[in-house]
């Protein structure tokens, strides 16, 4: 019984240290920064090359990865864009896949709270 109480206390203490993700925007959208973001997103959707949808990640906390273009023999494609939310958690910048909730760390990328606008 003591072990169970100690385990619950320890887990509660550890989870209290971690903040919930909050909406964020990128501080810098230079070509170098966007190249890093694009490579993280490409790995997240498991594609070598991606095209980002419209929007300004320095103003909006969302980045959209467009689906691959239909091939020459395809009339249309049922593929949908993949939406990622830019989030700040414990001072670090991540993109969170909206449908699955999976988080991807943006190494070396600086974000700020979206509510600071």
Kindly give the residue locations of the regions a language model identified.
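Bacterial N-terminal signal peptides that target proteins for export
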Residues: 1-6
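C-terminal motif of bacterial Sec signal peptides marking the signal peptidase cleavage site
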Residues: 13-16
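Bacterial signal peptide processing site
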Residues: 18-20
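Second-shell loop/turn segments in exported
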Residues: 23-28, 83
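Mature extracytoplasmic domains of secretory-pathway proteins
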Residues: 31-92
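C-terminal partner/receptor-binding element of secreted or periplasmic proteins
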Residues: 90, 99-117
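Short linear proline/tyrosine/threonine-rich motifs used for host-factor recruitment
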Residues: 95-97
């Amino acid at each position: 019984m003591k072990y169970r109480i100690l385990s619950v206390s320890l887990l509660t203490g550890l989870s209290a240290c971690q903040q919930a993700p909050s909406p964020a925007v990128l501080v810098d959208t230079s070509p170098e920064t966007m190249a890093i973001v694009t490579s993280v997103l490409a790995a997240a959707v498991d594609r070598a090359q991606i095209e980002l949808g419209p929007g300004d990640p320095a103003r909006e906390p969302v980045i959209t990865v467009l689906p691959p273009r239909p091939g020459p023999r395809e009339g249309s494609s049922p593929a949908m864009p993949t939406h990622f939310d830019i989030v700040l958690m414990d001072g670090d910048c991540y993109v969170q896949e909206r449908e699955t909730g999976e988080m991807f760390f943006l190494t070396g990328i600086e974000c700020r709270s979206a509510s600071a606008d």
